[in-house]
Amino acid sequence: MLWFKNLMVYRLSREVSLQAEEMEKQLAAYTFTPCGSQDMAKTGWVAPMGSQSDALTHTTNGQIILCARKEEKILPSPVVKQALEAKIFKLEAEQGRKLKKTEKDSLKDEVLHSLLPRAFSRFNQTMMWIDTVNDLIMVDCASAKKAEDTLALLRKSLGSLPVVPLTMENPIELTLTEWVRSGSPAQGFQLLDEAELKAILEDGGVIRAKKQDLVCDEIAVHIEAGKLVTKLALDWQQRIQFVMCDDGSIKRLKFCDELRDQNEDIEREDVSGRFDADFILMTGELAALIKNLVEGLGGEAQR
């Protein structure tokens, strides 16, 4: 089981049926296939349990996990530039004239196509968790762009996917700033030793504090000067540590050893049993964390 490292959280904006059996058929039409000789990138679904199962969905207690794989061809720009310059030089010498910009652009496409079959590939996988009980979708990635790309694949697979980023009633940075200013985060949370503060004005500067007590005169001065806390490291019930960001993303999730070792009694040979147990454990903990976090941040924005 791959324990999530980050969370981009989305709210299903209207009621939609997400049944694993039906989804399995819909996702099958978009199973991952490797890049062909002229493909720059390919994305598709793979089994979240890897070699242990061919199923593209894994479901327990209303929680569904999916896995998207992306292959990208790597063409270093210096290699492309060198090949293009050589081709331009050769043609200009043969024709005795300078090539036009449109001709050079056309040549660049030719060069790219000629290099693609020899290009190396970079692969990455993105896990997605659908909480059908709470109507939420979580993507395990650190950027909104990557999350949106994964959601776009799911939307294409299902035909429609009405989701919006989970947003709070109050600006998150104002709540985080108050937690640091007062030294009193919401119940169940504890300030750790890392934060980022930004001035309201773009050219007002950024302060990054690491391994530092945040409830101190130095940080207080920055807050009094108008800086807002945009990232804050927190501990939740001594079970999960993470960084809360002002855009609503939850980064650098770290589960305590007690949690991660909770299913150690399951035999190593029982890979699917361990995956299932860890999935139930992780989603249960994260669902509770998200619920507490939303409450602590002042509640979800009214839709």
From Swiss-Prot:
Record localization: Cytoplasm, Nucleoid
Protein name: Recombination-associated protein RdgC
InterPro entries according to UniProt: RdgC
Family membership noted in the UniProt record: Belongs to the RdgC family.
UniProt function note: May be involved in recombination.
Alphabetical UniProt keywords: Cytoplasm, DNA recombination
GO CC term, one of those recorded: cytoplasm
GO molecular function, one term: double-stranded DNA binding
NCBIfam families: PRK00321.1-1, PRK00321.1-3, PRK00321.1-5
One Gene Ontology term from the biological process aspect of the record: DNA recombination
Cited Pfam families: RdgC (PF04381)
